[in-house]
Curated annotation (Swiss-Prot):
Subunit annotation: Homotetramer, a dimer of dimers. One homotetramer interacts with 1 SecA dimer.
Biological process terms in GO annotation: protein folding; protein tetramerization; protein transport
Family annotation (InterPro entries): SecB, SecB-like_sf
NCBIfam families: PRK05751.1-3, secB
Name of the protein in its database record: Protein-export protein SecB
Pfam families in UniProt: SecB (PF02556)
Family the entry assigns: Belongs to the SecB family.
Compartments, record wording: Cytoplasm
Keywords, alphabetical: Chaperone, Cytoplasm, Protein transport, Translocation, Transport
Entry GO MF terms: unfolded protein binding
Primary location class: cytoplasm
Main function: One of the proteins required for the normal export of preproteins out of the cell cytoplasm. It is a molecular chaperone that binds to a subset of precursor proteins, maintaining them in a translocation-competent state. It also specifically binds to its receptor SecA.
One annotated Gene Ontology cellular component of this protein: cytoplasm
Length: 167
């Protein structure tokens, strides 16, 4: 088995929004309840890098870390209870070397664990900055265990596939 190597070529904010629907009437006398949703997506890109004669095979992927944070408060003056909704899609362009020699599991682990683990601190900083600019204390997201998230989704997909076989 060859050495797996993953490189990042670029990282960027693909989408960013902050909804502050009740701002003129909102007073944060209590700590809001924060609900965070995280999703990871990977899309294989066409193209190559390198010089002629380079025999090393690389596979390029755009990995998107989608984070949505919704802050809810209990305030009789605010009908829907929404303090803010902050959403970002933070992306990176990664290459995986020796792609053809890797198993599907090795590639998936690199893309869905390694990629978002690298991107998360940058996405967290963007969210903290944007929520602060919206007039709220900076939202500092807790670290995410992307390996546990990947394992849980893998088990769920296997369970769904086995259930489909019985129907």
């Amino acid at each position: 088995m060859s050495q797996q190597k993953m490189r990042i070529h670029n990282q960027y904010v693909k989408d960013l929004s902050l909804e502050n629907p009740n701002s003129p009437f909102l007073s944060l006398k209590e700590v809001p309840n924060i609900d965070v949703m995280v999703n990871v997506n990977s899309v294989k890109l066409e193209g190559s890098e390198g010089t002629e004669g380079e025999s090393e095979e690389k596979s390029f992927h755009e990995i998107t870390l989608h984070i949505e944070a919704k802050a809810m408060i209990k305030d009789e003056n605010i009908k829907d209870g929404v303090a803010f909704i902050c959403e970002t899609k933070y992306c990176g362009i990664f290459s995986v070397e020796n792609f053809a020699e890797l198993s599907t599991e090795e590639v998936n682990r690199a893309l869905f664990i390694g990629g978002p683990t690298f991107l998360f601190p940058f996405a967290r900083e963007v969210i903290a900055r944007v929520t602060s600019s919206g007039g709220f204390p900076p939202l500092m997201l807790d670290p995410i265990d992307f390996e546990a998230m990947y394992e849980q989704q893998s088990r769920q997909q296997k369970s769904n596939a086995s259930n489909e076989n019985f129907n």
